[in-house]
């Protein structure tokens, strides 16, 4: 998808995701999970709200929301920062390490990060949804972007079970604790039986 145009807004992004999920769910034999990290968690909630309203296919077994506090929390305006400021921000938050700092990789990533950030920054829920679906909230205890009081708001976004799963590193714990993150997601069926 790297050669495709950037999404203009959250509506466009979520409509694309919705269409892809619909195609996959129609062919799937098993229940599915819907999730995302940071901006992706907000997008997952927006897509799930759309699935519920349209009733074209079943709701996910659960939503996996990682690296996101309150859905209506104030967002840092990353899209208006200079390239060096974006790089500094991502290094500080733990999102860049190793090979990702190579110049060619940065030239590829910075425009994507800026465009995605703009979509996220310009979006807000008119009213945060409360959905009839289980949720797994994955977070880092060391992430300044997800204060405890905001994490507790996820209890208001579901009429069903909300499971909190802590990690240790930083906002990008899915990169730094990759194996544990993957193992955790694989084991969610133990908690959510649909």
Residue ranges: model-predicted function:
Residues 110-128:
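Active-site nucleophile elbow and catalytic-triad environment of alpha/beta-hydrolase enzymes
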Residues 137-139, 143:
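Short beta-strand/loop motif that positions the catalytic acidic residue
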Residues 49-88:
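Flexible "cap/lid" loop of the alpha/beta hydrolase fold
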Residues 33, 37, 62-64:
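Residue in the alpha/beta-hydrolase core beta-strand immediately N-terminal to the catalytic nucleophile
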Residues 144-150:
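Conserved alpha/beta-hydrolase "acid-adjacent" motif
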Residues 36-40, 44:
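Gly/Ala-rich beta-loop-alpha elbow adjacent to hydrolase catalytic centers
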Residues 163-194:
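Catalytic active-site module of serine/aspartate enzymes centered on a nucleophile-bearing elbow/loop
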Residues 1-32, 69-85, 167-171, 191:
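Active-site catalytic motif of lipid deacylating hydrolases and related acyltransferases
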């Amino acid at each position: 998808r790297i050669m495709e145009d950037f999404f203009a807004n959250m509506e466009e992004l979520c409509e694309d995701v919705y269409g892809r999920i619909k195609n996959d769910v129609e062919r799937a034999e098993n229940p599915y999970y819907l999730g995302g990290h940071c901006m992706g968690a907000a997008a997952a909630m927006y897509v799930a709200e759309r699935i519920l309203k349209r009733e074209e296919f079943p709701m996910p077994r659960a939503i996996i929301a990682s690296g996101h506090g309150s859905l209506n929390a104030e967002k840092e305006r990353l899209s208006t920062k200079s390239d060096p400021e974006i790089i500094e921000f991502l290094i500080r938050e733990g999102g860049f390490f190793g090979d990702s700092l190579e110049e060619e990789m940065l030239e590829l990533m910075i425009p994507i990060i800026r465009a995605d950030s703009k979509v996220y920054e310009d979006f807000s829920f008119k009213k945060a949804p409360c959905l009839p679906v289980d949720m797994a909230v994955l977070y880092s205890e060391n992430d300044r972007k997800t204060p405890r009081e905001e994490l507790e708001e996820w209890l208001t976004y579901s009429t069903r079970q909300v499971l909190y799963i802590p990690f240790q590193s930083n906002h990008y714990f899915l990169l730094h604790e990759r194996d544990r993150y993957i193992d955790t997601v694989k084991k969610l069926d133990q908690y959510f039986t649909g």
